[in-house]
Amino acid sequence: MKRALAVCLLAFAALQAQAGRSCEQVRPSPELILKGMQLAERTSQQLDASGARVVLLARAGQDLSKYGLRYSHLGIAYKTDEGPWRVVHKLNQCGTAVAAVYRQGLGEFFLDDLWRYEAAWIVPTPQVQTQLLAALNESPSRIVRLNVAPYSIVSYAWGQKYQQSNQWAVETLAAAMEPATINSRAQAQAWMQFKGYEPTTLKLGPLTRLGGRVGSANIAFDDHPNEKRFSDRIETVTVDSVFAWMPRAGLGAAPVAFKLQ
């Protein structure tokens, strides 16, 4: 048990340096580590029971209730041939405006100082699962081909200057569905629009925008069209909007949630 906790602490410290949250060195309590690992275990059991090979998996790392949002971060989870589930997702390096794509286990995914110990996922249709699994099994360079390092947590849903984590996941989904024709972010976004995706519109006034831009390296608004930005309409990709879109577009089942008691 002591060895397991030590490993968890190391994993947690690594995530703090990459997940776009506070860079303060806060030692996690054994209780938080245990809860994160319990959530990972229970989620794995439920994913196994679903019969899925690939899901879009979300966590609640921040309190976004004032924006009407429940989940903060989205990844693509898949069941390996060996049995364990892995998650491919984009993480912001703390204190910076850059990000990269990582493959991690469920334990690491849920050890990121969660606001709420709840997992949620969508099981894609069999066709979408097949396409995603094929993409995930390709070379690493293929799965990250639409990733760009410049990062803003509120990047414009239809822009290419920045890219946040949820945006990478859904653009990667688009590329997996049309691998022969989608080779750029603009093409992926055109496919999303064709399928009826609608981003979340956040109402952020000028003082909120100014405070966010000055106080955080990973928040920028200059990629948003002026007519939207200056009317306080910030359109960005959120987990909640993706979860509403996929069933509507016939790409997946209704979202499933599990909350650790």
Protein language model features and the residues they cover:
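Short hydrophobic/aromatic-rich motifs at helix boundaries and adjacent loops
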Residues: 5, 45-47, 141-142
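N-terminal, Lys/Arg-enriched amphipathic/low-complexity engagement segments
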Residues: 18-52
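Activation targets extended, charge/polar-rich intrinsically disordered C-terminal tails
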Residues: 144-261
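Sterically constrained small-residue positions within well-ordered secondary structures
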Residues: 8-10, 48, 78
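Sec-dependent signal peptide recognition
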Residues: 2-8
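N-terminal signal peptide c-region/cleavage motif recognized by signal peptidases
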Residues: 12-17
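Acidic/His-rich structured neighborhood in mature extracellular/periplasmic domains
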Residues: 23-31, 35, 61-192
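A short, Trp-centered hydrophobic/proline-enriched beta-strand micro-motif
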Residues: 51-59
